[in-house]
């Protein structure tokens, strides 16, 4: 019986407890002049994630999405969304947990953030903006490689 209980405790667990918008901002610093010009924007997307342990096996993950649209030299709009979620994640190894917090959870949050961005841009009366899907698994793998490369010279110096 104790063996069964140990197996149950070690079984991977993943549950979404809540998904919510933590912060939003939409700015049109050069309005109304921006509406009088030919629309040929350059759109820049910045992403960031962070996670916080709230309790045993309970984590908040925040995906920050910043979209900046420039029309020529002027900023047409700046849209910022912090989409968050509270997740129950247990029974994972440290690398599995890091991947869940850095890639899997942001994959869940991104469609909500994308919808918020599209809605704010539309309400700002700009042409529709649909953000392309993001491969958070690839971004996380790149982050892990960069950390490993940054740690390598330190290890060589200590040898």
Curated annotation (Swiss-Prot):
Listed Pfam families: SecB
Assembly and binders: Homotetramer, a dimer of dimers. One homotetramer interacts with 1 SecA dimer.
Chief site of localization: cytoplasm
Membership in a protein family: Belongs to the SecB family.
Subcellular localization, as worded in the UniProt entry: Cytoplasm
A single GO molecular function term of this UniProt record: unfolded protein binding
InterPro entries (alphabetical): SecB, SecB-like_sf
Transmembrane segments: none
Entry keywords, A to Z: Chaperone, Cytoplasm, Protein transport, Translocation, Transport
GO biological process: protein folding; protein tetramerization; protein transport
Function field: One of the proteins required for the normal export of preproteins out of the cell cytoplasm. It is a molecular chaperone that binds to a subset of precursor proteins, maintaining them in a translocation-competent state. It also specifically binds to its receptor SecA.
GO cellular component: cytoplasm
Name of this protein: Protein-export protein SecB
Entry keyword annotation includes Cell wall biogenesis/degradation: no
Keyword field contains DNA damage: no
